[in-house]
């Protein structure tokens, strides 16, 4: 079994309120990864963000924080969770975001999303730091098929970034640890459920539904832990309604 841990980048999903399906979806993703199944998902905005983080580090962070170093490696908080800050400035973490659209950049620098605040708080826990920083950097995305260098936005660099400094928030950090401890046993239960799934062929899956059975994707279940068993077809999991 592959070792998986709850990470800062998705910790807001564990903290989400409502029905609990957001948290359940994250726990299920980790359980799937634990048995070697991982669905890769990417969008142009995600690709843009990843490709331009180093650019933002060199253009924005390094001139202002000469001691800063690119890090992007996992740091354990405990055996169940950890964080991967993009940058370490001495012992304090920094995370860099590169919004894809101008309006997204403006919106986020006016009010940083709470999910990023939680992410930085968890990075601070990993680094045992009292301070963490969040960097927003706007750079023009490359268009599909464009072979030449991207022509940058005609705005001065000082208007294309903003850095937020956060101090340690004991309440949110304690809540993060509580949610991780609460979710770890659920992950173990889901791993067991997946490992003991009833494996059926595509043919059986097809004909059973033609004859009246109803299967739904496991992700759609309101409470996976209430299921007695699940069905596996290739690398996909379902439950019977």
Regions found by a protein language model. Give the residues of each.
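Accessory terminal regions of nucleic-acid processing enzymes
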Residues: 1-241
């Amino acid at each position: 079994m592959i070792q998986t841990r709850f990470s800062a980048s998705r910790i807001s999903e564990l903290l989400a309120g409502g029905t609990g399906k957001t948290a359940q979806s994250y726990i299920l993703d980790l359980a799937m990864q634990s048995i070697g199944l991982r669905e890769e998902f990417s969008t142009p905005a995600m690709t843009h963000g990843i490709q331009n983080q180093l650019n933002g580090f060199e253009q924005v962070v390094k001139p202002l924080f000469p001691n800063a170093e690119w890090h992007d490696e996992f740091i354990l908080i405990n055996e169940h969770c950890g964080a991967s800050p993009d940058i370490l400035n001495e012992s304090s973490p920094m995370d860099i975001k590169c919004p894809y659209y101008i309006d997204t950049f403006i919106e986020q620098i006016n009010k940083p999303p709470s999910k990023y605040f939680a992410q930085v708080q968890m990075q601070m826990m990993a680094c045992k730091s009292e301070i963490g920083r969040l960097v927003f950097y706007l750079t023009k995305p490359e268009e599909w098929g464009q072979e030449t260098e991207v022509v940058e936005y005609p705005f001065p660099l000082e208007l294309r970034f903003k850095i937020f400094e956060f101090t340690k928030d004991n309440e949110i950090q304690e809540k993060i640890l509580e949610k991780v401890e609460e979710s770890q046993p659920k992950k173990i239960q889901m791993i067991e459920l997946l490992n003991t799934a009833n494996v059926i062929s595509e043919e059986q899956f097809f004909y059973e539904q033609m004859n009246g059975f109803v299967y739904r994707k496991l992700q759609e279940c309101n409470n996976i832990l209430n299921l007695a068993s699940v069905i596996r077809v290739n690398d996909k999991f379902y439950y019977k309604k």
